[in-house]
Each structure stands twice: as structure tokens, then as C-alpha cells.
Amino acid sequence: MADNQGVQKAGDVKIEQLKLISSTNVIYDLTEFLIELNLYEDIFSNYLTGSIVLSDSRNLFDMVPIIGEEYLVLKFITPSFPTSVQKTFRIYKTSDRQVVRDKNTQTYVLHFASIELFYDVLLPLFTPFEGEITDIVGDLFDSYIAENRDFQISEAADEIKEIENVTPLYVKSETANKVKFVSPGWTPFKCINWLASKSIPKDGKAKNFLFFESNKSFCFTSIETLFREAYEDNTSIGKYSISAAGIRQSDNRPDIDREYFLAKDVEMVDTTDHIKNYTNGYLANRLLTLDVYNKEYVVTDYDYINEYGKQYHTSGEGKKAMPIFTGDSLRNPATNISFYPVNPKLFNDFPDNVSEKMKDIYGNRKSSLLDLTNLRMNISVPGRTDVEVGRILYFSYPAVSPSDSSDANETQEDTNYSGYYLITAIRHKVSKMNHTMVMEIVKDSLTTEKTVK
């Protein structure tokens, strides 16, 4: 973390730019109108979204006019931190417009999303692709998504120019399989999502690839890679615990370093539902691959309990991670059956295309992604602009009673719910003076011997 110089309290924020660029290239500073800005990122979303609640006593809505096709230049930073959240977005909708304060002020909400989304939805592709999956993903991104779509605004706010500030794509996991297909009018994002669902990693066992945008970059990776990197490189963002009131140093000043890692409004969203897991394919599932050329079918059963120890999890290596089930847990692959067509003669010069690999991918991917739905929490913490989805944190969930008469409650952890969690979604709530993150965190294993100090 940064040295906190210039930070008065955890959650301090500096909004360096909040500019609206109209369809006629007129610039408006929205900072004085701001009530609250919300920025959303999610590992299951290809792009960022957000909304701004504005209080307008100057009739900006009609003066611009705001019609839902404006650009939003956003930059905010945690004071003394090295990284900021910076991006140019596109306004796509207005809502909740109402007059308040004796008809002298109006409030409304502007909804925005990543600029890349608008180029994506308007670009159906009818194009053939062939090669390594990660190479195709890179080509799709470079050719159709990664263009210069950022703006630089002068301090005098009277000049706009486009700059080379492309949101980068990081491919964290290389794939081992090749694919050949023709896009049937899919957009670039849909093509990449389809490729993610058909990817086999070069390193690792889990076929849980995703394509998403964080507040720093686009990312194409397997979830297992995120777990392995955090575990091997010790890149957890820190140890969080539930907030207690009145935490101060002896000089009665806030302990800012500690308060950054105090969570409040902790909500347990999902816990293990074994009846659901018996039937949704999590513990075991079956795939019927139908060969439309040879008129044959193959039954492939996948048993996650037998495969769990071969993969990395939130707690680290599979052989050290403790699953939420036992080796004797009930399961029957026939409770969850799926079908997939195989056409080995679709391309004469391309054997082992993706359809022939699905028996190795489908069950593994289904189980490992469902593993992220068993233990899920929402926590509210002071905002930091160096945090993004896809990172790992340690959350200390308190035990309700001491282990013996000599122990203090506050030093004990619940062994089931404490441990490493993956940040799957963040809602950044930003006002003029404060930044709060509401984080969705999940784990796919229970506490192991390795702990965070």
C-alpha cells in the first residue's frame, strides 16, 4: 500500500476529472453537480458500467442538451496511491429525472458504459478464424476493440483531442488447443466469450476461462490462473476483518492503515446448498456428444470430487485445499445431462476441432464455475484505486465464541468462512469526498494451514 501521506481518513478520494463532452464537443464539468457516482466491474461482464446521480440547478440537462450520446471522461484516485481509475465512457441513457426544491433544482441519473461496448454491438462479424485460441482472442481485440478512444482535455477545458490510451488486454493464461470456425454474425465480445468456453489451458487443469474488464484492463484468463498467481506470488491485497467502532491510536488519530482493511455491512449472500449441488451438475454431470457424421454418441461422466485436488483453488493447491464436500458426498451424473453435437468432418484439414474436445471441457468447466456460487459474501470497505476484480483477499470472519476460557473472542476465526476469497464484483461508490467499495467475494475451499499475517 501507499504511505497514506495526505490521506485524512480511509476512503478519501480525489476526483481529478469528471467531464461531460456533448455531441457538439462542448465540455461541461460535472463535479459541482455530483451527488454520487457508481462504477461497476464484474468478472462475468465484458465491460464496465456505471451511473451518476446529479443535482442540477442550472438546467444543464436542456442546455447541453443531454440526449444519451455524450462522452464521460472520468479519473479519480486515492490520495498518495500510485494508480488511479481512469477511462472515457459513453453515456447511453438518462433516467429518474425529477424537479425538487421548489422547482429550482432537478435531479437525474446518467447511465454510462465502456466505449468498447458500443463498437462491439454495432459490429457483427461474418469472418473465418483459425489458430490457437489465445492468438485469435488477441487478433479480435486488436482488430475490432482496441482503438484510440480516449480524450485529453486541457486544463482550460476548451480543447479536446483524442490520445493513444487504449485499455489494454492481458492474456494471463495460454491455451493448448486450436480452433477453426466462422463467426455467424457474432460480435467480437461474443466471439471471445465463445472461445473462452472452449479453451483448454496449457498450464493447469481447470477449463474455467473468462473474458472481463476491470478498472485497469481487459483480461482473458482462467480462474485457476488467478488463484495460482495469488498463491505462488503472494499477491493478496491484504487481510480484511469486520469493523469495530472506536478504533484509534493513543494520540486519538485514526489508524488509517488498519481502517482500510475493516469491513462493514457484511452480508452472507450464498452458502452451500447440497440439494442444489446434487442436481445442478456441480458434484457430477454427464455429457452426451452426438457425432452427426458417423451417427454415434459418446457418454462422458465427470466427477468433480475426484478431480478437485488436481486444481488450484482460493486456498491454494488442490491437494492442500479443503473442499466444501467430502469424498463420500452423494452424487449421480445422470441428474444433470447435457448434449453437444460433434461434426468431425466439418473441416477436412482441421482434425480435433473444438466440438471433438468438448467431452474434455464441458463437465470440468461447469463444476469449477459452479464452485464459485457456494460461499459468497458482500462486504463494504473503504475505497482504494489500486483494487480491481480478479484479485484475492483474505477475510477474517469472527467466531461467535472463544475456543476456551483463556481465549478472547476477537482473536478467533470461523474456520469455515475465514480464508482467501476472489473478488468477483465491485461497486465503487464515489462522492465528492468519499470512496466506498461494495465487493462481492467468493471462495471455493475452506481454510487451510496457510494464513495471512
Residue map of PLM features:
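An acidic/polar, Gly/Ser/Thr-rich interaction patch typically located in mid-to-C-terminal regions
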Residues: 39-65, 242-453
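Sec/Tat-exported extracytoplasmic proteins
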Residues: 62, 144, 196-199, 203, ...
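Envelope-exposed proteins and targeting segments
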Residues: 14-16, 48-50, 70, 85-87, ...
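Solvent-exposed coil/turn segments that connect beta secondary-structure elements
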Residues: 42, 55-57, 77-79, 92-99, ...
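Assembly/oligomerization scaffold segments
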Residues: 1-124
